[in-house]
C-alpha cells in the first residue's frame, strides 16, 4: 500500500500523539508499505510574537499554509493511496481527501464533549467551542474510523450525523519496551538517580495536569491511605510541574514531605519507576484509552483505577477498581478508595505475585505487533473497498 499519515505539527510540543503517529508509520514501513508523514511546518509560528498571538500564527501554519501544500502534493499521489489521520482532532484536513481512501484514528472525545457542555469540570470558552466545531465539521465527513476503545467508539457514533461506513476498535499497543524488573533493584537505582527516599517502596502516579487525570484526587487518596495504613511509603508523581491548584493542595497535606514531583522524566526512568512501585494509582475521571494502566501492569505493578470505561476495558479483571471521584465529596471518596489501596498494600508475597501475574497476562493484549497487525488489515480492506472512499 501507499500510505500518507497526517500528523500534528512538531511545534505544538505534543508527546503521545507524535509517538502514536511514528508507531504507525514505522510499523507500516516495516511491513513493506510505502509510507509518508505529512504535518505542518513552522513558518508563521516561528515569528516573534507574544503567547496568544503565537497560537494564532500556528493556526495559519496549520489551516492556511498546510492545506495549500497538501493540494499540491495530492497531484503526485497514486489513486490507491490511503490517507490516514492519526488523530480525529486533525479533522479540518479531512475534506482535502474526501472521495479518496482514508481512515481516521479516534483517541478521545473529551474536548468535543467539553465544548458541548457535557463535562462541567472542564468548561470551554467561546473560541474553544468554535475550534472544536471546526474539528467536528471536518471528521464527520469521513467514512472510516478506528477508535482506541469501545468507549471512544460510542462517543464517535453520537457525534456523527449518520452511521459511518466503517467503525472499528483496536486497542493501543504499548509503544515502549515495558517489562518487569527486580523491584528492589529498580527502587535502589531510582533513589540514586533522583535523590529521593524511594528505596523502601513508593506509590506512583504518571500523568499531566489535565482535569481528567485527577492529580488532586491522587493527593486526596494518598492522604486518606496514609491516615489508615501502617505503611509510610512516599508518593511519586511523574509528569508536568504541578499547577497552582495542585501546589495549594500539596501545601496543606499532612504528608506533603512524603509527596514528590518528578518533572520531565525520560522514558527509561519512567519504566524503572513502574517496575519499582508498590502500587500504581490511576484514578482518572475519564480517558480515551488509559496507556499507563497497561504500562504499569506490563512492568509488574498492581494497578488501582476507576471503575469506569475505558479504564475498565484496559484493566479488565486484573485491576483493583475504585469509584470515580464525584464533583463534590472528595474526602468521603478518598476514604472509601483508600481501603482498596490498603488491600493491595497488605497482600502477602504469594497473593501479590498472583496480582502481578494477572496484570502481566492482561498486558499481553496490548502489544504493538498485535495492534499494528489489526490496523494493517483494516487499512488493506479500506483500499480494496470502493465504497470506503
Describe every region a protein language model picked out:
Residues 1-389:
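Carbohydrate transferase catalytic cores enriched for Leloir-type hexosyltransferases
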Amino acid at each position: 500500500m501507499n500510505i500518507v499519515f497526517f500528523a500534528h505539527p512538531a511545534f505544538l510540543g505534543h508527546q503521545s500523539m507524535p509517538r502514536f503517529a511514528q508507531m504507525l508509520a514505522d510499523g507500516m514501513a516495516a511491513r513493506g508499505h510505502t509510507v509518508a508523514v505529512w504535518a505542518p511546518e513552522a513558518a508563521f509560528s516561528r515569528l516573534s510574537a507574544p503567547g496568544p498571538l503565537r497560537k494564532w500564527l500556528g493556526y495559519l501554519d496549520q489551516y492556511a499554509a498546510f492545506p495549500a501544500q497538501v493540494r499540491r502534493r495530492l497531484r503526485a499521489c497514486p489513486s490507491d493511496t490511503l490517507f490516514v489521520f492519526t488523530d480525529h482532532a486533525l479533522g479540518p484536513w479531512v475534506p482535502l481527501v474526501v472521495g479518496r481512501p482514508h481512515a481516521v484514528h479516534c483517541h478521545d472525545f473529551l474536548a468535543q464533549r467539553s465544548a458541548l457542555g457535557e463535562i462541567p469540570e472542564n468548561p470551554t470558552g467561546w473560541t474553544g467551542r468554535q475550534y472544536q466545531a471546526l474539528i467536528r465539521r471536518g471528521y464527520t465527513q469521513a467514512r472510516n474510523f478506528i477508535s482506541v476503545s469501545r468507549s471512544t467508539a460510542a462517543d464517535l457514533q453520537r457525534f456523527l450525523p449518520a452511521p459511518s461506513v466503517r467503525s472499528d476498535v483496536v486497542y493501543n499497543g504499548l509503544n515502549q519496551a515495558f517489562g518487569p524488573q527486580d523491584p528492589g533493584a529498580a527502587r535502589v537505582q531510582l533513589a540514586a538517580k533522583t535523590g529521593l527516599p524511594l528505596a523502601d517502596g513508593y506509590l506512583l502516579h504518571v500523568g499531566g495536569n489535565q482535569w481528567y487525570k485527577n492529580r488532586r484526587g491522587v493527593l486526596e487518596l494518598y492522604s486518606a491511605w496514609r491516615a489508615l495504613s501502617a505503611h509510610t511509603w512516599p508518593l511519586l508523581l511523574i509528569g508536568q510541574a504541578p499547577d497552582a491548584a495542585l501546589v495549594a493542595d500539596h501545601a496543606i497535606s499532612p504528608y506533603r514531605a512524603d509527596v514528590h514531583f518528578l518533572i520531565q522524566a525520560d522514558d527509561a526512568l519512567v519504566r524503572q519507576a513502574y517496575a519499582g512501585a508498590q502500587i500504581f494509582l490511576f484514578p482518572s475521571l475519564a480517558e480515551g484509552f488509559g496507556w499507563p494502566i497497561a504500562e504499569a501492569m506490563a512492568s509488574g505493578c498492581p494497578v488501582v483505577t476507576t471503575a469506569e470505561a475505558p479504564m475498565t476495558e484496559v484493566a479488565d479483571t486484573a485491576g483493583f477498581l475504585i469509584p470515580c471521584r464525584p464533583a463534590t465529596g472528595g474526602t468521603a471518596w478518598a476514604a472509601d478508595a483508600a481501603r482498596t489501596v490498603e488491600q493491595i498494600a497488605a497482600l502477602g508475597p504469594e497473593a501479590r505475585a498472583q496480582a502481578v501475574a494477572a496484570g502481566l497476562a492482561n498486558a499481553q493484549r496490548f502489544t504493538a505487533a498485535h495492534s499494528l497487525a489489526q490496523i494493517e488489515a483494516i487499512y488493506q480492506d479500506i483500499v480494496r473497498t470502493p465504497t470506503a472512499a
